[in-house]
Amino acid sequence: MKLPCWQMIFSRWTALAILATATTLGNPSLGRSATQEEENTRGEQNSRRYCRALPGYLFEFPRDHFSHPCYKVEWWYFTGNLAAESGHRFGYELTFFRVGVDNPYPNPSRWRVDDLYLAHFAISDLGKKNFFYAQRLNRAGIELAGASQDKERIWNGNWVAEFTEQGWKLEAVEGDNRIAFEMRSLKSPVVQGANGISQKAEGEGNASHYYSLTRLETSGYLEIGGASYPVTGLSWMDHEFATNQLQPNQVGWDWASLQMEDGTEWMIYQLRQTGGGRDPHSAGSFVASDGRTVQLEEEDYQMVPLEYWKSPHTGGTYPIRWRILVPRLGLDVELRTEMPDQELVTQESTGLNYWEGSILVQGTRNGKPIQGRGYLEMTGYAGPLQPELYPSD
């Protein structure tokens, strides 16, 4: 069966997977943003009217927190590690996706579908080893979902990320599960990659525009299974927009965000190729406690799997303990999870399965002990990453 492109998306980077289909079907400047006309010219729009992510993009905030309809796919990704006063610990994810719909026929109706919006909401109760997740799909028409600079928010039904002068407010409710957080950004946005782009594959435009808010001080309330907890902790936000990214030989990825107790952050990912090799476009970044950023290339680090977990839901086998080494910056840490079962099974909507969950980080930097918490995402271990992604016409 040939799936519509929106059915390919569920995890924060599973959106990368549909970008290949869309085509067949030091810290860079945070200065002036491109206008829509400049995006159109520089982006060299393809036959389906979308721009490509090319070098030279200049980010402008808060404008770039919101929608970029010139690009086929866009996502806003929030995760965090939080604790109640009792020490009871939680992880969470709230992610919003926008996917452009190729419609060659003009339609003035407010019900028309120009974009589809998906959203994912998950809570990891690390104390009780309970994992909850839900998903949504809505059209942009009649304001069922959207990402508006005027309204200063991204939403899908009553799941909302609202921009404020201090940072963000998040709220999501599904049954007797809920999050309601206020977040204050402690650091400026970090642009990932060189010259305004995060290159994901060989070839011009096979990239995204990608930035992160790496340290969001978070407080509020969390409910799971009807039990309510006041919580505090740290969150991470990623925002990417693009049109072309992955290629057929890229079969999955392992991505980690690390927030250390010394005030530093790390983002590292590896793209896996058919045959088991690591793609040379794997990359990452280090953010010092004062906000200075160091971009990491594929040769700068190693990700070594140490322990595996076999899912009782899909039969997939995931590496749930890793060693990460960045010799250039003196880092040697292990990542492990307190709760192996944080797999999302999405056969009823996307047909994709992936692991996304809270992790502990412990090791050394320059020979001194270091520890923290983070989030780990792994795709392509439980069935094809891109089912029917490259069908013949």
Language-model regions, residue ranges each:
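Structured soluble/peripheral alpha/beta segments that form catalytic or ligand/cofactor-binding pockets
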Residues: 2-4, 31-393
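Short hydrophobic transmembrane-like helices used for membrane targeting/insertion
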Residues: 8-9, 18
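Bacterial N-terminal signal peptides
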Residues: 14-24
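Cleavable N-terminal signal peptides
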Residues: 20, 29-31
